[in-house]
């Protein structure tokens, strides 16, 4: 693994292109229109605004894999709207923080691209494997907020009847706001999973499509374009330098024989594959408290990869367990970065402990989703096995 050239790896060229796509969508105000349209369309559901926020987060996550961007934008857009509507602060905070973390799992995820490079796996199969787990987690979040608001309406009051526009206007908003962005997402993912384009090529098409959407919404301004380019360059540089530093540490660790010691320790324990999976996921969970996902992937995942083969675990299934597990690194106090992103944009309106309390139920849902996927591996493996059957 360590003999490969990293910085000229063609798969990594997709990272800045997907970032550019996400920042264009954000700066063009497309996400705000999307949230408004979904909020109107789901007004009959309990916690309709929370449902709209989670759906918007899931869709926006397909355009950008940067957690901070999603949580920050939704913290400025959806959180104040929910509070004005009478939503409980802890409940609203949990929705924004958990929904904003979906970008690390739902493809085309930057984390999955980096994982593909490290583990030498097919990014196409990883994307296919992540679709159903990502939808499952988003669906569990939505189901939770609906059930909780149904039994405790004070958490998320229903909108007044006079606030709901006619059906024709709702349909118009959905067609104008939801359909174009959803079509762009389907185009990007469809070309990747259909084998018509590499992730980098699909990202380039998506970035061009975002420019077209910005023009369509009359928000294609030089200021927005310049900010998108600057933020893309800044975030790409941050990711690449984290990559270089973490990879250097991992290379030295491997050269000094650290991997062999770790492997021999595990092999000497005489454990079953399921025990190996439980131990590794506990380790990843604990590492998520002090470390970013890049350090976890680049430093520790290469240690586990030979053991994955030794215990006969499907590498794509293992990757999906880690991807789900890394959700917890953004939700687990005291280093729950999503909470600090939200606190940063709403510092005067919510206490950090309120955010932490709101996050806890969603953290439990992530752990439940991991158990569910472990019990039913087909959630992750059916689609890639079907699409790429040899």
Regions found by a protein language model. Give the residues of each.
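Alpha-helical transmembrane segments of multi-pass membrane transport proteins
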Residues: 3-390
């Amino acid at each position: 693994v360590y003999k490969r050239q990293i910085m000229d790896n063609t798969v990594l060229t997709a990272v800045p292109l997907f970032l550019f796509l996400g920042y264009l969508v954000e700066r063009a105000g497309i996400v705000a229109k999307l949230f408004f349209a979904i909020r109107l369309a789901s007004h009959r559901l309990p916690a309709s605004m929370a449902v709209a926020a989670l759906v918007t987060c899931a869709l926006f996550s397909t355009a950008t894999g940067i957690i901070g961007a999603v949580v920050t934008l939704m913290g400025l857009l959806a959180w104040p709207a929910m509070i004005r509507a009478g939503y409980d602060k802890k409940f609203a905070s949990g929705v924004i923080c958990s929904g904003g973390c979906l970008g690390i799992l739902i493809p085309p995820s930057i984390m999955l691209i980096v994982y593909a490079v490290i583990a030498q796996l097919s990014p196409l199969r990883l994307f296919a494997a992540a679709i159903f787990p990502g939808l499952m987690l988003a669906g569990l979040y939505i189901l939770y907020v609906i059930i909780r608001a149904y039994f405790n309406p004070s958490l998320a009051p229903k909108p007044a009847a006079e606030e709901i526009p006619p059906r024709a206007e709702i349909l118009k908003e959905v067609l104008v706001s939801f359909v174009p962005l959803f079509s762009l997402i389907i185009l990007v993912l469809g070309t990747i999973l259909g084998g018509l384009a590499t992730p980098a090529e699909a990202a380039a098409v998506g970035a061009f499509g975002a420019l077209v959407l910005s023009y369509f919404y009359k928000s294609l301004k030089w200021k927005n374009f310049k900010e998108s380019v600057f933020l893309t360059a800044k975030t790409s540089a941050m990711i690449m330098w984290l990559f270089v530093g973490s990879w250097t540490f991992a290379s030295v660790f491997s050269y000094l024989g650290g991997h062999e010691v770790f492997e021999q320790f595990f092999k000497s324990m005489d454990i079953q594959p399921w025990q190996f999976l439980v131990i590794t996921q506990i380790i990843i969970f604990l590492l998520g408290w002090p470390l970013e996902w890049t350090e976890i992937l680049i430093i520790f995942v290469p240690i586990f990869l030979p053991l994955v083969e030794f215990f006969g675990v499907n590498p794509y299934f293992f990757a999906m367990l880690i991807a789900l597990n890394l959700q917890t690194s953004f939700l687990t106090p005291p280093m729950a970065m999503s909470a600090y992103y939200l606190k940063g944009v709403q510092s005067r309106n919510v206490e950090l402990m309120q955010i932490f309390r709101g996050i806890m139920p969603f953290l439990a849902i992530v752990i439940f989703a991991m158990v569910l996927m472990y019990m039913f591996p087909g959630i992750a493996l059916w689609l890639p096995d079907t699409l790429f059957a040899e």
